[in-house]
From Swiss-Prot:
One of its GO terms (biological process) is intracellular potassium ion homeostasis. The chain crosses the membrane at residues 37-57. Pfam families: Na_K-ATPase (PF00287). Residues 58-290 are extracellular. Residues 1-36 are cytoplasmic. One of its GO terms (cellular component) is apical plasma membrane. The C-terminal lobe folds into an immunoglobulin-like domain and mediates cell adhesion properties. It comes from Canis lupus familiaris. This is Potassium-transporting ATPase subunit beta.
Length: 290
C-alpha cells in the first residue's frame, strides 16, 4: 500500500512525458509509430476532402435551382411603397418647413431635388430607349446588350414646370413648391389592368377655409405610364429608372402646418394598410411661412 501511495518525483514525471513524446525502444511518437501517423493523417485528409466535395456539390445544386434574375429577398407587400422628394424627416415622418422670404430655409430642399433629378438627365438615360407606347412593355427575351432587357427613358424635362429646367427653384420661392412622387420597384408588378396609375394629393386634415388642395401634376394627370412596367429586376434591367410624378401645390395656406397625403390610384395598389403608412401612399407635413 505504501508503494502504491508513493508519489512520483518531478524528474520521474518529466522522464515519462519525454518517453511519451518519443519512445526510442518502440519508435513511437506521441503514442503512435510513424506509419500509424501517416495512415491516420491520410484518413483525415481523405475524410475532409470527401466532406468538402459533398458540401460543394450541395451548394452547386442549390445555386443551379436559383434564378439569377430573381432577387434573393423580396418584400411581402402586394403594393409598392411610395417615396417623396425632397425627403426631410422630423420626429414623426416627413416634415417640411420653410420661409418663402428666406432662401436659406429652402435652398437645401431645392438642392435635394436637383441632385435627385441628375439620374434623369440625358447623360444618365443614354443607355435606355425611347418608348412611345402607353401599354405594358412585356419582354419575353433578353434582347438588350449583355443579356439584359430594355428600359424606357424617363427624362427630367417630362416634369415640365417641376423639372428644375424652367424654374430652378421648383416653385419654392413663390410658395408653390414642387414635390416629386416615386413608387418603389416590385419585380413583375402590374399596377392595373389597362389604366395607368396616377397620383392624387389632398389635404388630410380640415382647414378653416375648407378649400380643397389645388395641384398641377406633371406628366399631365399625374400618371405613371404603363410602359415602365413590369420591372424585371436589377440584373435584367441594370439601367432602369423609376417613372416619376411631380405635384406642384398651388394653394397651401401660409403660416399653418398642413398634413398632405399623396395616394397612388390603381387597380392593384392599396393604401389602407395600418401597419405600413407608406404602402400605396405617402403622407407629409408642410409649413410655408411668409
Amino acid at each position: 500500500m505504501a508503494a502504491l501511495q508513493e508519489k512520483k518525483s518531478c524528474s520521474q514525471r518529466m522522464e515519462e512525458f519525454q518517453r511519451y513524446c518519443w519512445n526510442p525502444d518502440t519508435g513511437q511518437m506521441l503514442g503512435r509509430t510513424l506509419s500509424r501517423w501517416v495512415w491516420i493523417s491520410l484518413y483525415y485528409v481523405a475524410f475532409y476532402v470527401v466532406m468538402t466535395g459533398i458540401f460543394a456539390l450541395c451548394i452547386y445544386t442549390l445555386m443551379c435551382t436559383l434564378d439569377p434574375y430573381t432577387p434573393d429577398y423580396q418584400d411581402q407587400l402586394k403594393s409598392p411603397g411610395v417615396t417623396l422628394r425632397p425627403d426631410v424627416y422630423g420626429e414623426k415622418g416627413l416634415d417640411i418647413s420653410y420661409n418663402v422670404s428666406d432662401n436659406r430655409t429652402w435652398v437645401d430642399l431645392v438642392n435635394i431635388l436637383h441632385n435627385f433629378l441628375e439620374g434623369y438627365s440625358p447623360t444618365s438615360q443614354e443607355d435606355n430607349i425611347n418608348c412611345t407606347s402607353e401599354k405594358y412593355f412585356f419582354q419575353d427575351v433578353f434582347g438588350a446588350p449583355n443579356h439584359t432587357k430594355f428600359s424606357c427613358k424617363f427624362m427630367a424635362d417630362m416634369l415640365q414646370n417641376c423639372s428644375g429646367l424652367t424654374d430652378p427653384n421648383f416653385g419654392f420661392a413663390e410658395g408653390k413648391p414642387c414635390f416629386i412622387i416615386k413608387m418603389n420597384r416590385i419585380v413583375n408588378f402590374l399596377p392595373s389592368n389597362s389604366t395607368a396609375p396616377r397620383a392624387d394629393c389632398t389635404f388630410l386634415d380640415q382647414h378653416k377655409d375648407d378649400r380643397p388642395l389645388q395641384v398641377e401634376y406633371y406628366p399631365p394627370n399625374g400618371t405613371f405610364s404603363l410602359r415602365y412596367f413590369p420591372y424585371y429586376g436589377k440584373k435584367a434591367q441594370p439601367h432602369y429608372s423609376n417613372p416619376l410624378v411631380a405635384a406642384k401645390l398651388l394653394n397651401v395656406p401660409r403660416n399653418t402646418e398642413v398634413l398632405i397625403v399623396c395616394k397612388i390610384l390603381a387597380d392593384y395598389v392599396t393604401f389602407d394598410n395600418p401597419h405600413d403608412p407608406y404602402e400605396g401612399k405617402v403622407e407629409f407635413k408642410l409649413t410655408i411661412q411668409q
